[in-house]
């Protein structure tokens, strides 16, 4: 049964007159037009046409507690009464920083910024400034934000819409960015051997959540840690997605691999804009005002985002991680079983509360294989799920997430929808 989306269509036509492409981020667009949200609560989105969707996109990751969490709203309302921006330090910045340091293994000091993009840009600047080297290694398909250093062979919306290399970025900017396949130890060794004493850092998503959900091969992250230490190269974990999601201390706690620097975002802001660079004290103290490496921002440490972050992290206990991982595994297992039952070529990957399906008969271990997935079949799967009241990201090059509000009743409804969708998907 087709969705009623008349009001969304009308709003999209109006939006196109004033907003580029009718949206403010490419990942929000899908053909023929996206639904427009009126409100959200727990694990549900409600659109302007009165449709209700179980949400597995969760704003592309941040809403681990579900939407409109009572404790977060209460804390933010109280802070709003006290002011929304000061341009001065606050005690709450210290409180959240201490919580981050307590949880994240590599974090001895913190610098709050406003987005994951800002965090990775500043982390790379820090690595270059500390080492005095220019070159960086990034992995094909990894998305580390929308800045020029790393927007080459990118994932996320850049891959979804067919522009992994953005025009407008001079070759001079990216000539020091070395691109190699994920999960390939030999490629890392070759890149380092060919650029001896020139590489400042390797930046990596421990889970490639912007090309779907590509997992590191066993021992791969440990290998990156060892080879960077051997060659005096800094290792940066981009944990904008995995931070506080895989475990209290993120991927570095989950895998037991501690980088030199990490970037955080999404969950850290409890639904409000935020980012953070964290790392060893001797590295972090090279940022201004203590050091010469400049990093600043009008809204760094914004009290609204900081308050929401404190209220969010307080609720991420052991039960949270156990439950969100349990429900994600159930859904991933269901997708595998349905693909097998209906003889559909598909691979499903899951870790903690992250999962995704690729319509592909090969094991998806890197960007090149992910690109070979059947996007037409995925969009058929996406629309059929949407018609059944289940919203997943509109691209298999994004990741699905569970929140603490995805309880057994919600999961059962989702499984029923998935079963219906796979009938005739061949």
Swiss-Prot record:
A GO BP annotation: protoporphyrinogen IX biosynthetic process
One Pfam family here: Aminotran_3
Cofactor(s) named in the record: pyridoxal 5'-phosphate
Keyword Cytoplasm set for record: yes
Catalysed reactions, semicolon-separated: (S)-4-amino-5-oxopentanoate = 5-aminolevulinate
Name of this chain's protein: Glutamate-1-semialdehyde 2,1-aminomutase
Family: Belongs to the class-III pyridoxal-phosphate-dependent aminotransferase family. HemL subfamily.
Name of the gene encoding the protein in the UniProt record: hemL
Residues recorded as bearing N6-(pyridoxal phosphate)lysine in the entry: 266
Keyword terms: Cytoplasm, Isomerase, Porphyrin biosynthesis, Pyridoxal phosphate
Primary localisation category: cytoplasm
Record lineage: Archaea, Methanobacteriati, Methanobacteriota, Methanomada group, Methanococci
Molecular function (Gene Ontology), one example: pyridoxal phosphate binding
Gene3D superfamilies per record: Aspartate Aminotransferase, domain 1, Type I PLP-dependent aspartate aminotransferase-like (Major domain)
Pathway: Porphyrin-containing compound metabolism; protoporphyrin-IX biosynthesis; 5-aminolevulinate from L-glutamyl-tRNA(Glu): step 2/2
Subcellular location: Cytoplasm
Keyword Kinase among record annotations: no
